[in-house]
Amino acid sequence: MKRSLMKDGKMLRECIEQYKYYSSGNNQMVVYTCLRDSRVFVPWRAGRVNDMAFIKEKGKRYLPVFSNEAQQGDKAGSFELAEKDFVDVITAARFANADGILVDPFTVPFLVEPGEYDTISRMITRTTSED
């Protein structure tokens, strides 16, 4: 798969929507594969290293990421968006002791729990950098 197809987050959103509609283990692995090769947007405060936004719900802290900038909507507050490889976000979530990574939390949310981080990180990339 060409990395350019992953660029706008559309493929990631479609994989998540398919999983939500046809919730199965196979579709979950498709989402994980797509996440493995995705660049996502992470809210953070400019000028402050490792100062990321968290969504707090029922005593848990989730690191939100967005498939593209539009998915954040008007909820930016004092945060800017940094574009990162999803596997780098996993490292940040571990470092911050997040209870999970919440993809597109304001539209069609998909939760990646800490127990799945290694599964995603160890997947072989399916993208090529050249068109």
Residue ranges and their predicted role:
Residues 1-131:
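An interfacial alpha-helical scaffold signature
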